[in-house]
Every structure is written in C-alpha cells, then in structure tokens.
C-alpha cells in the first residue's frame, strides 16, 4: 500500500544460546518473509512495514530502540503493530490483541479464522493477570503498546496447562523455547507435521488480515460490545519473561 497510514509487522531474529531458535523465533521470521513476498504486488489498505528485530531475548532492545525513534507523526500514522513470536511448537495457535475496541486486529483475525476454518483461538482468560484476548508484555509488541499503538500478536503455545500463563507450550514436552530442544530436528521428530501446519495457517491468516484490515470499513456497530468468552479454571503463578 501507499497510504500515509501504516501497519508494522515484526518478528525478532535472535535466539538464546540453548538450541537453535527454530521455534523462537525462526518461525516468526519465516512467516514475516513469506507474507511480505505474497503481498509485495498486492494493494493493501495501509502501507506495511516489515521488520526483523534484534536483541529481543536481552530486554526487547531492538523493538525498544525502533519505537524510541518514532516521531509523534509516526505514532499517529501507525494503525497497529503485529508481532509474530514462536509459531511452530505450541499445542494451540493463538492471536491476541489490545483490550476493548483497540483489539481490532485480534477480532478481525478471529473472524477471518472462523470463515476460513483455521484453528486459531485466543487466550481464554484462565489467569486473571492476563485478561481474555490479551497477553503479557514479554515480546516485541510491548514497546509499541506503551506508545498507545494497538497491537496484534500471533503465537503457538498452550494457555490451559502449567501456570496458565502461556509459557508451557506443550503437554508432551512442556516448554521448548529457551531449551536445547529448540531445533528443527527435535520439533519435526516429536511433533511431525506441526511446523508445516502452523506456519501455513499463520501465513494465510496474516495475509488475509493485512489485505482486509481497514478501520474505515470496520467501525464498530453502535451500542454493541464484542466480548470474548472467558474460560473458568483456577490459576497458580504468572508467566515469567519469555
């Protein structure tokens, strides 16, 4: 798109020393590159800025720096920031977003997923520290959120196990990110077909969202508030830094 309004789409390309970062976060970067290639000749409602951030694992340094360099005009012209982090391993595929009306990226993604029969859900709110539909500030969406920019966030994990904070990715092996198991060989052996399925679905979803997201055409209906159904289950602890 050539609009003065923009959507920032980002994924961090660094990883921790353990493993090789196949899930966290080569998977996110791969989907960003795929969607950028698909959309490069397609007209979109807004201009799209694709970014690979560095140093996420050491305090969100790349995204913090980028956000700190944005002018007031840049901030005003940014419709949303969409973050992709750790898409390959988790038992379930999720989309999160800002609370209330600013959660339009999440809401559109869920509507799109329902229409296309894609297996995408959102955080059900089992842990009251992370209300339904939202997530924590542990990834590259956080610096933009602090600027008041609405966010969307794609991730694969499992919010219904462990401490109910989205940190325990799988029932079979717990968390894979930040461990020596975060390699393509391990993931494909233990979860055959999951990488291909997840990255394909996330690519389709993100492409459709970026092609169709237009706030002028998506103004909320009067006197109706979209609510995300919360699940009911006790929780233990809150999620630590990702």
Per-region residue spans from a language model:
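Flexible glycine/proline-enriched surface loops and loop-helix/loop-strand junctions
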Residues: 15-17, 87-94, 126-128, 137-138, ...
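Extracytoplasmic/secreted envelope proteins and their assembly/folding machinery
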Residues: 6, 10, 29, 33-36, ...
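Solvent-exposed, acidic/flexible segments
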Residues: 6, 21-29, 56-60, 98, ...
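Alpha-helical metal-binding/catalytic segments enriched in His/Glu/Asp
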Residues: 5, 9-60, 206
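Metal-dependent peptidase/peptidase-like ectodomains
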Residues: 43, 53-153, 158
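Short beta-strand-to-loop junctions in surface cap/lid or active-site-entrance loops
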Residues: 1-3
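His/Asp/Glu-rich mid-to-C-terminal helical/loop segments that flank catalytic regions of hydrolases
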Residues: 160-242
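Surface-exposed helix-capping loop/turn segments at secondary-structure junctions
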Residues: 41-43, 116-121, 211-222
């Amino acid at each position: 798109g050539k609009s003065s309004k923009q959507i920032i789409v980002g994924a961090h390309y660094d990883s921790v020393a353990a493993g090789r970062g196949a899930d966290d976060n080569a998977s996110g970067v791969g989907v960003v590159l795929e969607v950028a290639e698909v959309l490069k000749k397609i007209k979109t409602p807004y201009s799209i800025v694709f970014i690979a951030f560095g140093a996420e694992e050491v305090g969100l340094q790349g995204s913090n720096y980028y956000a700190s360099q944005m002018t007031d005009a840049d901030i005003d012209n940014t419709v949303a920031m969409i973050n992709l982090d750790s898409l390959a391993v988790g038992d379930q595929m999720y989309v999160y977003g800002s609370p209330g009306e600013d959660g339009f990226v999440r809401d559109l993604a869920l509507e799109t997923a329902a229409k296309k029969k894609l297996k995408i859900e959102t955080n059900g709110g089992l842990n009251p520290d992370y209300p339904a539909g939202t997530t924590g500030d542990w990834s590259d969406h956080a610096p933009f959120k602090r600027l008041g920019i609405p966010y969307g966030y794609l991730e694969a994990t499992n919010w219904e196990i462990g401490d109910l904070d989205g940190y325990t990715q799988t029932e079979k092996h717990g968390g894979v990110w930040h461990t020596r198991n975060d390699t393509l060989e391990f993931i494909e052996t233990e979860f055959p077909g999951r990488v291909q399925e997840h990255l394909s679905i996330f690519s389709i979803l993100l492409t459709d969202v970026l092609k169709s997201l237009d706030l002028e055409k998506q103004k909320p209906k009067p006197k109706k508030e979209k609510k995300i159904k919360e699940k009911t289950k006790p929780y233990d602890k809150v999620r630590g830094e990702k």
